[in-house]
From Swiss-Prot:
Protein name per UniProt: RNA-directed RNA polymerase
Domain of life: Viruses
Its job: RNA-directed RNA polymerase that is involved in both transcription and genome replication. Together with VP3 capping enzyme, forms an enzyme complex positioned near the channels situated at each of the five-fold vertices of the core. Following infection, the outermost layer of the virus is lost, leaving a double-layered particle (DLP) made up of the core and VP6 shell. VP1 then catalyzes the transcription of fully conservative plus-strand genomic RNAs that are extruded through the DLP's channels into the cytoplasm where they function as mRNAs for translation of viral proteins.
Record's keyword annotation contains Cell wall biogenesis/degradation: no
Gene Ontology BP annotations: DNA-templated transcription; viral genome replication
Annotated source species: Rotavirus A (isolate RVA/Human/United States/WI61/1983/G9P1A[8]) (RV-A)
GO molecular function (one): nucleotide binding
Record-linked PROSITE patterns: RDRP_DSRNA_REO
């Protein structure tokens, strides 16, 4: 098993290195004889350690346990209380501590001053501007680095160079921290005033970022980039990331395309050997030079030099360095500003009368027409979703904050909560629920705010609107989104596509006579100038739609939606500033509405169309594509002559002038070869992604536990690695060791082993091999999985109490009654379960469940309870299949060119052999006929788990299920009697299995699973028609082959002779697979 357990035991002896420290390994086995020996071994170890005897002789005596059983966990005692970190740190603090430049940032508190200078007293103090928001501490991070350094101090050759580079960088960090002392965190991993008052305010978050960067250093270039960012980010907490990453928007326009991938008619990527010259007017070079000069002004030396050197020949080979700099710049950490500054940022824009009214008018009309186009069909057909919009809204109501804390009574229990779902229940119980009245957000009821922090940008504010806004918007927005789903212009929503498709779309139309215009419109979206035309466009669209229907319910839905827009035109926000809460009139559009994403996309599309229609007055061209993707829009324009420098310059200046006529402060660029938007950038005909996910600092604190955060950390590490930013894996594993340990008492800790953390159970945190998801099939693996399943679901007294209260029951019954035409236990129970699950975001419930889980886990990690579960997991299925496969060596040549240069070699190799995929595999069941049938008549959306359960019921029961959801009896019986139903069984099973196997996550999402090259490595003689069995056999074979290729860089072929007698058994088993939710799966989901 290896590496993790080895690091674990070494780490424990590194951290607990005093005389009194003891580490006792705990083993388990599925073999009952060996299990007895494991228990004896453990008992004797505990006994000896109590007497203070050495455990060496026991290790000899129980060699059979150590060799044949599986390590479950390590129990560690240490009576030595801390300051161990400080002692070790001194040895590394040999350099000169950094001194912060206290004039580096415009806003006073963004300067890295001593905390007591920024906050005079503990009452004034807030950690919100520097809170790492992660459940691990600076001292742990320091320990992890020092552990790595100690472990590698004797490395030779190239490894020694890496050691020296990291040691040098760590000396800077250690010396600076040592000067002030290591800040101690409290039990919530926060840094209080008492600890911070005599230390620089940003010390902790800076140190975390620096550690993350230095542990990602491999080459000399990495070292130079990291050194510069570490030193400068100590002072510059505001603009560093922006300065360093700005040039990229121009760099992408400088590289000739020599061969690229384009999307063909079948929406696949195919290679095209076209050559396109980068045509760059001098003006663009001047702008780039200005950016580089700004970097130098800010004290950067090496990074601007690297860019300058690259500019000499602008080669694609050396562009990886540019791409690296771009990714690294985000790892300086989040820019966290005070709410007041974030809000006033939007309000600083001066209103000018000198704007082009005609353009604004055109913009508004385009928004109006798009809204009408999106909603015309559902409105004319009196779509049931628009009629029952309120119910649909309630069913998908989130448990996020409603903006104010209220005292609520559930049965005999009185609680305080801000959660929307609880407020709705309470209001319904007390007759205060009036979804037909949208509360104003004017000066009398200003909007409370949330925040969004991103590296390299200013803090943005988020409206926390009353739940009535959500209910009013939900159904209409869902319809808008389903329109966007089949409209190519909306890159973000386009059906099942992924970013590779959008990439091929751009490169497809690039040629010597076309140019691409790309604009970052994030400033415009949140500007005051946008508000009136934007809201008015929506309102006008809704008015037109209201005239297209006679159904009072649909009209009511549209009117409520319109009311939300009217109210928001006159919006005030409340901002805490010190001890006072300021009310400010806020004239701009902010996130927080249900419509945010959809409406912004519509507005951005309208904006670029407005601009293009003006450009068309002056030039003659064909618009080949227009796309909007979040805050960015881009268009490819084809002219009737070859593009020249002068043309690029003219178009560029005209576009900028047109935007300025609308007072839009946006960054608009024109290029012939590449684009750069927030989500991805295309350079030299290849696609790149920014690997900018912070590992040791988080944006905000949620209610995830240390285990969840360990899984998220690993998941972030994987995403970065796929995008070309690699952090040392040993360091990541050390962090996982720290974050998954469980304290029993002050001096007793339990550290789970690799087997516990990598088996896919409810506790899975990471994969033992990066990019490869293994499903254990050995006896010990299945044994531990079963053991964990026995304690997966935890009860919460508070949740039970709330759920048994009249308030809760009435609410669930109200939903069921409105939704169902006749009794349907599955759905009613489903609603109750969903509503009860929403209570999890209420902290006391969460903590209670967590405590129960920890104590169960503690018992388990000391001795697993053998447990005969009747549940079947995906592991059981694969375990049944495995013995019938025979492996032989095979050969698969590299046949595709690289299009994503940042991929790790092993993943790149697999793609080059079998090809990539440009679509998401459907894993939600939404493509099945039963799902479409339900959505035709009901607002209820069953999950893939529920569909999987329902489709395997008896036909009579399926029919009742459908009828109760409002499907006409004749349709229901036709469905059950038709061939469609048996196709559905297969489709849903397929989706469910894909979902279980995380086929759309990690690096699996990049591989073409239907590649003929892959198929020809698999031979399965065809016996009997059970498509589901054939499917699972093939899928298993594909995963085996791909995993082997990732691991070994070589190919195998598989032959399977599956006995017919076993097929029917397997098929029955496949209808009882239990889904396992773990921190690992939720971290994957979190990436989405």
């Amino acid at each position: 098993m290896g590496k993790y357990n080895l690091i674990l035991s070494e780490y424990l002896s590194f951290v607990y290195n005093s005389q009194s420290a003891v580490q006792i390994p705990i083993y388990y086995s599925s073999n009952s004889e060996l299990e007895k020996r494991c228990i004896e071994f453990h008992a004797k170890c505990v006994d000896s350690s109590k007497k203070g005897l050495s455990l060496k002789s026991l290790f000899e005596e129980y060699k059979d346990v150590i060799d044949n059983a599986t390590l479950l966990s390590i129990l560690s005692y240490s009576y030595d209380k801390y300051n161990a970190v400080e002692r070790k740190l001194v040895n590394y603090a040999k350099g000169k501590p950094l001194e912060a430049d206290l004039t580096a940032n415009e806003i006073d508190y963004e300067n890295n001053k001593i905390t007591s200078e920024l906050f005079q007293s503990a009452e004034e103090y807030t950690d919100s501007l520097m809170d790492p928001a992660i459940l691990t501490s600076l001292s742990s991070n320091l320990n992890a680095v020092m552990f790595w350094l100690e472990r590698h101090s004797n490395d030779v050759a190239d490894a020694n160079k890496i050691y020296k580079r990291r040691l040098d960088l760590f000396t800077i960090v250690a010396s600076t921290i040592n000067k002030y002392g290591v800040p101690r965190h409290n039990e919530k991993y926060r840094y209080e005033y008492e600890v911070m008052k005599d230390k620089p305010y940003y010390l902790v978050t800076w140190a975390n970022s620096s550690i993350e960067m230095l542990m990602s250093v491999f080459s000399h270039e990495d070292y130079l980039i990291a050194k510069e960012l570490i030193i400068l980010s100590y002072s510059n907490r505001s603009t560093l990331a922006k300065l360093v990453s700005s040039p990229m928007s121009i760099l992408v326009a400088l590289i000739d395309i020599n061969g690229t991938f384009i999307t063909n008619e079948e929406l696949e990527l195919e290679f095209s050997d076209k050559y396109i010259k980068a045509i760059v007017p001098d003006q663009i070079f001047d702008e780039l030079q200005e950016m580089i000069d700004n970097m130098r002004k800010a004290g950067l030396v090496d990074i601007p030099r690297m860019i300058q050197e690259w500019l000499v020949d602008c080669s694609l080979e050396k562009f990886t360095l540019m791409s690296k700099i771009y990714s690294w710049s985000f790892h300086v950490g989040f820019r966290k500003q005070k709410m007041i500054d974030a809000a006033l940022d939007q309000l600083k824009t001066e209103y000018t009368e000198d704007v082009d009214g005609e353009m604004y008018n055109e913009y508004t009309m385009l928004i109006r027409d798009e809204i009408v186009k999106m909603l015309e069909v559902p409105v004319k057909h009196d779509d049931h979703l628009l009629r029952d919009s309120e119910l649909a809204g309630l069913l998908s109501m989130s448990s996020a904050s409603n903006g104010e804390s209220r005292q609520l009574k559930f049965g005999r229990k009185t609680i305080f909560s801000t959660k929307k779902n609880m407020h709705v229940m309470d209001d319904i119980a007390h007759g205060r629920y009036t979804p037909g009245v949208i509360p104003p957000v004017n000066v009398d009821r200003p909007i409370p705010l949330g925040r969004r922090d991103v590296p390299g940008r200013r803090t943005r504010i988020i409206f926390i609107l009353p739940y009535e806004y959500f209910i009013a918007q939900h159904a209409v927005v869902e319809k808008m989104l389903s329109y966007a789903k089949h409209t190519r212009e909306y890159a973000e929503f386009y059906s099942q596509s992924n970013q590779l498709l959008s990439y091929g779309d751009v490169t497809r139309f690039l040629s010597s006579n076309s140019m691409v215009l790309y604009t970052d419109v994030s400033q415009w979206d949140s500007s005051q100038h946008n508000t009136q035309p934007f809201r008015k466009g929506i309102i006008m669209g809704l008015d037109m739609l209201s005239n297209m229907t006679n159904d009072p319910k649909v009209v009511q839905t549209l009117n409520l939606y319109k009311q939300t827009q009217i109210n928001l035109m006159d919006s005030y926000v409340q901002i805490p500033d010190g001890n006072v809460i300021k009310k400010i009139q806020y004239g701009a559009v902010a996130s927080g509405e249900k419509q945010t994403k959809a409406a912004n996309s519509i507005a951005n599309l309208a904006l670029i169309k407005t601009v293009l229609s003006r450009i068309a007055n002056k030039y003659s061209f064909i618009t080949k594509i227009i796309r909007v993707d979040g805050d960015d829009n881009y268009a490819v324009l084809q002219f009737n002559t070859d593009v020249t420098k002068q043309m690029v310059q003219d178009v560029s200046n005209d576009v900028r002038y047109i935007y300025s006529r609308m007072n839009a402060k946006v960054k608009a660029l024109v290029s012939t070869v590449g684009i750069e938007i927030a989500k991805r950038y295309i350079a030299g005909g290849k696609i790149f992604f920014r690997a900018g996910i912070n590992l040791l600092n988080n944006e905000k604190r949620g209610q995830s536990t240390q285990w969840d955060q360990a899984a998220i950390l690993y998941s972030n590490y994987i995403v970065n690695k796929l995008r070309g930013f690699e952090t040392d894996r040993e360091f990541i594993l050390t962090k996982i060791i720290q974050m998954t340990s469980v304290a029993i008492t002050g001096s007793l800790r339990l550290f789970p082993s690799e087997r516990v953390l990598t088996t896919n159970s409810t506790f899975k945190v990471f994969d033992s091999e990066d990019f490869i998801i293994e499903y254990g099939t050995t006896n010990d693996e299945v044994y531990i999985q079963r053991a964990f399943m026995s304690l997966s679901s935890q009860k919460s007294g508070i949740a039970d109490e709330i759920a048994s209260s009249q308030t809760f029951k009435n609410y669930v019954n109200k939903l069921s009654d409105q939704l169902l035409i006749s009794k349907n236990v599955i759905v009613s129970k489903g609603i109750a379960v969903t509503e009860k699950a929403k209570l999890n975001s209420y902290a006391p419930v969460y903590l209670e469940k967590r405590r129960a889980q920890i104590s169960a886990l503690l018992t388990m990690l000391q001795k697993p309870v053998s447990f005969k579960s009747n549940k079947i997991t995906i592991n059981d299925i694969l375990r049944d299949i495995k013995p019938f496969f025979v492996t032989s060596e095979a050969n698969l040549p590299i046949q595709y060119r690289k299009f994503m240069p940042t991929l790790p070699n092993n993943v790149q190799y697999v793609i080059q052999c079998i090809g990539s995929r440009t679509y998401q595999i459907e894993d939600s069941g939404s493509k099945s006929s039963i799902s479409k049938l339900i959505s035709k008549y009901s607002v209820y959306k069953p999950s893939i788990e529920e569909l999987y359960k329902v489709i395997s019921l008896r036909e009579q029961e399926i029919q009742l299920y459908l009828v109760s959801l409002g499907v006409p009896p004749v349709d229901a019986s036709t469905y059950v009697g038709s061939r469609i139903y048996s196709q559905d069984k297969y489709k849903i099973l397929e989706s469910y299995v894909y979902n279980l196997l995380s086929i759309n996550y990690g690096c699996y999402q990049l591989f073409d699973f239907n590649s003929p090259d892959l198929e020809k490595l698999i031979r399965i003689p065809f016996k009997g028609k059970i498509p589901a069995v054939t499917f699972i056999l093939h899928l298993y074979a594909k995963l085996e082959i791909i995993n082997y290729a990732i691991k070994n860089g070589a190919w195998i072929s598989l032959f399977c002779n599956y006995p017919k007698s076993e097929m029917i058994k397997l098929w029955k088993k496949m209808w009882n697979i239990t889904a396992l939710r773990s921190p690992y799966t939720s971290a994957n989901f979190f990436q989405d």
